[in-house]
C-alpha cells in the first residue's frame, strides 16, 4: 500500500522579526516560533508539506515527510524539515520511531540575531498492549472488550542550537528516557501516565 499527500498552507513559523528578535533557540528549539494565530500570514509566504508512506505488509509501515517555508518577517530565509518514520506491530508488541532534521537558512541578518543553521532529533519507542483478565471480570463496564492498557518505553534525543553567553554558536544535546502506562477505555478516550 502506498499513500501520499501534499498541502500548501499559511507559513506557521515566526522565527525572526524585522527588528532582529529571534524565536529559535536552544531552550525550546523551533517550538517558540510557531504562530498559530487566526489569519496570521507572518511573511506572506506559503508553507508546503508533503508525506509519502509505504506498507509492504500488514503491521509494518514506513514513511517520509517534509515541510518547508520562509521563517523570517523579511521573507529571505528558508526553513526545511525532512523526517523519516516507521511503525512495526506484531501481536501485542509495537515498535516505532521518527527522526527529523531542520535545515535553517541564515543570511547575515539571521546569523547576527543568533539563528542556528540546523537542529535535529529522533525517538524510538517500544509498546506492549495488554488487558488483564482479572480486571475485565472485576469490572466489565470499565474494562470492556475494546479497552486496553499499553506499557511503553521511549528514548528521545534532540539537539538544538543557539548562542552561549559569549555569543559563540553552540549545540545542546538532550537525552530522555520515558517509561509510561496508558489506559484506553475506547479508541478515542485515553488516560496517559509517564515519567520524564
Locate the predicted segments by residue.
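Outer-membrane beta-barrel pore domains
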Residues: 60-196
Amino acid at each position: 500500500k502506498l499513500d501520499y499527500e501534499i498541502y500548501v498552507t499559511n507559513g506557521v513559523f515566526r522565527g525572526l522579526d524585522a527588528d532582529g528578535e529571534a524565536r529559535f533557540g536552544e531552550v525550546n528549539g523551533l517550538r517558540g516560533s510557531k504562530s498559530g494565530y487566526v489569519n496570521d500570514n507572518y511573511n506572506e509566504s506559503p508553507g508546503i508539506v508533503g508525506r509519502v508512506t509505504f506498507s509492504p505488509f500488514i503491521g509494518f509501515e514506513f514513511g517520509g515527510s517534509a515541510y518547508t517555508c520562509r521563517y523570517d518577517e523579511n521573507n529571505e530565509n528558508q526553513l526545511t524539515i525532512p523526517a523519516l518514520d516507521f511503525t512495526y506491530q506484531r501481536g501485542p508488541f509495537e515498535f516505532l520511531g521518527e527522526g527529523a532534521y531542520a535545515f535553517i537558512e541564515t543570511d547575515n541578518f539571521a546569523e547576527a540575531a543568533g539563528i542556528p543553521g540546523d537542529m535535529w532529533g529522533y525517538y524510538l519507542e517500544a509498546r506492549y498492549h495488554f488487558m488483564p483478565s482479572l480486571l475485565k471480570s472485576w469490572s466489565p463496564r470499565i474494562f470492556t472488550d475494546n479497552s486496553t492498557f499499553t506499557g511503553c518505553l521511549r528514548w528521545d534525543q534532540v539537539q538544538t542550537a543557539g548562542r552561549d553567553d559569549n555569543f559563540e554558536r553552540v549545540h545542546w544535546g538532550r537525552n530522555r528516557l520515558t517509561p509510561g502506562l496508558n489506559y484506553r477505555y475506547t479508541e478515542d478516550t485515553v488516560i496517559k501516565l509517564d515519567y520524564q
